[in-house]
Regions:
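Zinc-dependent deaminase catalytic domain
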Residues: 12-164
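Single conserved hydrophobic/aromatic residue that forms the stacking wall/gate
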Residues: 1-14
Length: 164
């Protein structure tokens, strides 16, 4: 649920400041949420915005099939077909940056879900130094162990993780 729905702008800023979320964190998380709506996955929509040290957007991504691969209902509604084929939002953002020659070193990744181990290793290897995701996200039980492992990967690699 969107905790800020229906709240005035002044109140939103006060809530964000009180809980340690800057207006920039709020903006980039909201943008990641908007980008997540571009996903055609019927069960999960995830968005990612990667931001440089000067608050410039370096790359964005959402979960979906690779370029040129038709996203049919049959593929998207069958996990056995979908999972091996789909690119996660973080992967899409990283691959888009690589495709266009943009460095993600020392950037912050704003994501609508905690990164899985697959995305954690990619974010770490890309040089992303901080991950921010909403604290109110409900995680399906089937993902809990994977997300716990990704948090351990981030901790060991000294990648900062913030739940906002």
């Amino acid at each position: 649920p969107d905790w800020s729905r229906g709240l005035g702008d002044v109140y939103k800023r006060q809530v964000c400041i009180r809980y340690g979320m800057s207006k920039w964190d709020q903006r980039f998380l909201e943008l990641a949420k908007q980008i997540s709506t571009w996903s055609k996955d019927p069960s999960t929509q995830v968005g990612c915005v990667v931001v440089g040290p000067d608050r410039e957007i370096r790359s964005t991504g959402f979960n979906g099939l690779p370029r040129g691969i038709e996203d049919t209902s049959e593929r998207l509604n069958n996990r056995e077909i979908k999972y091996p084929m789909i690119c996660h939002a973080e992967e899409n953002a990283i691959m888009h940056a690589a495709r266009t020659g943009i460095s993600l070193k020392n950037c912050v990744a704003y994501v609508t879900w905690p990164p899985c181990t697959r995305c954690a290793r990619s974010l770490i290897q890309a040089g992303v130094s901080e991950i921010v995701y909403p604290k109110e996200v409900e995680i399906p039980e089937r993902w809990e162990a994977d997300f716990d492992m990704s948090l351990n990967m981030f901790k060991e690699s000294k990648t900062l993780v913030r739940k906002e």
